[in-house]
Regions:
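Sec-dependent bacterial lipoprotein signal peptides
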Residues: 1-18
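A short, solvent-exposed, low-complexity linear motif enriched for acidic/polar residues
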Residues: 21-216
Length: 216
């Protein structure tokens, strides 16, 4: 009799297990991240600067060092995600770009300054550290600095969405020469920066980025 009872309990237990669903409940669903790319370029309409009463136009030999660091993306609740140089990066680093890298046939070149995994949701702004240090134009080498009371990290309002398995690309446009105001023997850099475009790409570019990064 005892043996029969044990067998009966085992059958009930097996029936219970078979009736349980193994599907993951919706409340435990974890969405796949998307990618955010941030590019920066200079405005092709801003190509001349007046130095000591003489107008100088941009040339392929000119340069302006622009230090970029500490990128963040803020969602609608003001929570932020840290931006990295590439999806293989494991820490934030500083990078310097020649923001007036000019090609006579094509205009200013652009630079990919961030490429990061981000949770899929709506975002409202970026913050990026942007500091110019020196301009080499014609025969001149001119030091550049931010205004004394201005922080190096710049807030950039921009509404955008990151979706699962997709890529969001933001391009920023800087007016390098219009941003500069002469002060004694140097120039103050006021960072006239705007959002040039926000573009969205599907899973094809997402897969390409992963393939090129050698991530699993």
């Amino acid at each position: 009799m005892l043996r029969f009872g044990i067998i009966f309990l085992k059958l009930i237990f097996i029936f219970f297990l078979s009736s349980c669903t193994l599907d993951e409940p919706n409340e435990f669903y974890s969405p796949t991240a998307g990618f955010l790319q941030v590019f920066i370029t200079s405005d092709d309409a801003d190509t001349t600067i007046n130095i000591l009463g003489i107008d100088y136009s941009i040339s392929e030999s000119d340069s302006m060092d622009l230090l970029v660091y500490q990128g963040k993306a803020y969602d609608l609740d003001s929570n932020y995600a840290i931006l990295y140089k590439s999806i293989n990066s494991w820490r934030q680093e500083e990078y310097t770009y020649n923001i007036i890298d000019w090609a006579n046939m094509d205009g200013y070149n652009d630079f990919k300054i961030f490429e990061s995994h981000l949770p899929p949701m709506e975002y409202k702004s970026l913050t990026i550290g942007i500091i110019a240090s020196v301009l080499e134009n014609g025969p001149y080498r001119i030091p550049i600095s931010l205004p004394s009371d201005v922080d190096g990290v710049l807030a950039i309002p921009v509404d955008f969405i990151v979706s699962e398995n997709s890529v969001t690309k933001i391009t920023l446009s800087l007016k390098p020469f219009e941003s500069m105001t002469r002060y004694q023997d140097s120039y103050v850099f006021d960072r006239m920066l705007e959002v040039k475009s926000v573009e969205y790409f599907n899973e094809d570019l997402y897969a390409q980025i992963i393939a090129e990064s050698d991530l699993p």
